[in-house]
């Protein structure tokens, strides 16, 4: 099921806001054990993905279709937002958020490159026929 850019902007913005609020509401519980600090980093990575989706959808609405997110400022801004939100919970959450976000960004890039990049035809060089050195 595919939704439009405006609907995706609204949904991803709402999910980003709810995830940030949930992380702040349960920050004491997320910082209580080792496994929950890793879970806090995973939630921060989800915040990164949702905020990047919202930011890119907003750019597509403003600048037109086909506008792609670049490393600076879109990805860095969303990553810093997610790392800041994770840092409000625990400092280990920042590290796990960064690791999970980089893994998620790798797979997002891999999937989007297979879907949206057109393959350029490969040009093979023509065989040069001519006189070369004569061998005796």
Swiss-Prot record:
Keyword Nucleus assigned: no
Entry's Gene Ontology cellular component terms: endoplasmic reticulum membrane
Annotated disulfide bonds: none
Ranges facing Lumenal side: 1-5, 56-75
Subcellular location: Endoplasmic reticulum membrane
Record key words, sorted: Endoplasmic reticulum, Membrane, Phosphoprotein, Transmembrane, Transmembrane helix
Function recorded in the entry: Subunit of STT3A-containing oligosaccharyl transferase (OST-A) complex that catalyzes the initial transfer of a defined glycan (Glc(3)Man(9)GlcNAc(2) in eukaryotes) from the lipid carrier dolichol-pyrophosphate to an asparagine residue within an Asn-X-Ser/Thr consensus motif in nascent polypeptide chains, the first step in protein N-glycosylation. N-glycosylation occurs cotranslationally and the complex associates with the Sec61 complex at the channel-forming translocon complex that mediates protein translocation across the endoplasmic reticulum (ER).
Protein name: Dolichyl-diphosphooligosaccharide--protein glycosyltransferase subunit KCP2
Biological source species: Bos taurus
